[in-house]
């Protein structure tokens, strides 16, 4: 789940650690946050005693009443109606729900969605439902599930007549219904593209894997000596994950294109002058030009974000548009944002070390800034 640390998801912090009992080596373990109401309270400005937290279909904290009302409303509503979707956007954290499903589908977690699913809301009139990403050890090509990088987990996640485990009908219902709405559908596609352009990039994932493996590989032999049935074929399993990271993006694009009848994946280039950034859907690039791939059929959202001391001037390609806009992408698409300083020249980083104001009458050193 560490792959999603910068995404709008609730994930457990963790670290590998070595255990010694009375100076005897006891193995390599993972220390993780426990997902309960206190986990929610430590990550959000809410009272942990005043939330609804559901695991699978049972309330661990609070009740299931509000969620049951949500499901009843969805089942009785026309999800193609924009007004219905706008209303649901006040009931569900839509961005979180999209990111959650994108994550589970991409990693091919098939011990879900009828299991290992927790979701919560503050018990407030405007409290929105959010989903927690945890226990994803069936993902990334786990051998005993078969397949992995070539499994169409998107179809799996919308199966209307699945078995009791792992994807029964109740567990896929909300996602299936939301996908009937064109606004949700387009946002889902764009977020998937955002992730494929960034954290789902093969090179990025393999670098993270290699870093994590390097961090613990020296202790694996000692762990195996202590627990002979643990970490069997460790190098092989690391390679399974590496293979998944290498091939999964291409397969996932194919599944998106087939499911949503998409065509014309185009390369888009974004440029920004000194003094600001461009937010592309959910991404704010670290450097420019930034290149991403998006579908010609699906408009993207862009927003010019000026740095302190700068103001947005405009887009040469869209001179009549403001700082935020939704635009189509097309072959050889380029977009540039222009910023200018409003301080009449180059800006500098100013550091104030000391301020003295209104000294005591008995020791008046004047007012000064240093």
PLM ranges: what are they?
Residues 270, 325-344:
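Conserved "repeat-terminator" motif of extracellular CCP/Sushi domains
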Residues 299-323:
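Surface-exposed interfaces of beta-sheet-rich extracellular modules
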Residues 341-370:
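A structural motif detector for short, solvent-exposed N-terminal "entry" segments of globular domains
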Residues 282-299, 321-327:
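Short, solvent-exposed S/T- and G/P-enriched segments that are highly enriched in secreted/extracellular
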Residues 6, 16-20, 25-29, 40, ...:
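Middle-to-C-terminal accessory/interaction subdomains
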